[in-house]
Amino acid sequence: MKAAITGYRGFIGKRLLSLCDLSIGIGEEYTKEELYRSLNEFKPNVVFHIGACSDTLNTDVNYVLETNYIKTKWIADWCYVNNIKLIYASSAAIYGTDKNLPSNLYGWSKLLGEDYVINKGGIALRYFNVYGPGEEHKGKMASMIYQNIKKDKVKLFPNKPTRDFVFIDDVVSANMYALLNYDKLKGRWYEVGSGDSSTFEMIFDLLGIEYEYLDKSEIPNGYQMNTLSLTKNWMPGWKPKVNLEMGIKRYKKYLDEKS
């Protein structure tokens, strides 16, 4: 199986690249002509389209839409014309604050990309809050777990917002499952999460880190108070294997060994 992977230097893309026997990584900056030349020369059996602007607070409309939507269209069109499998990294950000529509530019860009991929017969995987080994380079876009795991005390938003934290191994397994079962899964979206909704307080209790609360006025506009993947929206036959307690333990061990 020959795989082309966009975002191959990133958190998820790098893991997928290591699993595929024959694969190429496609960088973040490319023209349509450069993209098509690379794909035509390599002739992949599948494209994992992971690369994106992942900054949920970015308000540069031209940049976000070019990166997350226009380039997705290029890839989806090439895969459609050449009858190549396409697995697209979507996001739970498309649910926004009211569970119906995105509440920021990032969410809208991912929804547009997802719709286009599905209409071309691809698979869209809506990732929830991914965490685990390998996200160190993401900086402010790394999970809250990584950003605070070495601190003695953290500041949290009030009202106990919740997240569906999903371990990186389960996200990788979801991509491989989608590939292996492509023909029966293609043409729609699926959620990739743990199926459990956890407060940030639960995270830091597991880590033994103290916390205090920010003022309610500091909660930004468009902030999702709750996210949760539903098992009915998972790929039939796929399920995550790493629960929160297990994932936190593994992640902490990994970071301790690196320091």
Residues covered by each model-derived region:
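NAD(P)H-binding glycine-rich loop region in Rossmannoid oxidoreductase-like domains
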Residues: L35-T67, A93-T97
